[in-house]
Amino acid sequence: GAALKRYPREKLLIATKMSNFQNYTRENSIKMYHQSMKELQTDYLDYYLLHSVGGGEGIKTFHDRYIDNGVLDFLLKEREEGRIRNLGWSFHGSVEVFDYLLSLDVKWDFVQIQMNYVDWRHASGRNVNAEYLYGELAKRGIPAVIMEPLLGGRLSKLNDHLVARLKQRRPENSVA
């Protein structure tokens, strides 16, 4: 927050997430949200994510973390009141959970998915078809935020043979 104070707030886009993995009571989750605002020294967030949706027991865990305790309703109210400008979620799970979240009567402003530039069909360790995820978001007009476009950095580590071929073709360019 202190570093952000050096710049006009309207020039920044601030994103953070709710990582309520263990103690996901309403009270603790709301406290976590307010603590983020306090530490960031801001009165609104541009992007707020429900972090790592789809893990644990899938739909049941999502309900435990956000629905049954009223946390999602709280966050929707915060968005309505302007303290959250865009509400979304980062996805790490099965297609069943992904489709379920899209079926809810909630206007999601964005969704963060794993996708890399080489293989859209196997975007993560869970072998989730990122092409499907992206397509479903596009059909609904929901912006996709991409995480791990370099597959956790593995795609940026080229073997010597490939580096040599790239340098041979365009020696003046970086291999990145």
Language-model features: locations:
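A contiguous, low-structure linker/loop signature
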Residues: 8-11, 36
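Short loop/turn motifs at secondary-structure junctions
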Residues: 8, 41-44, 49, 83, ...
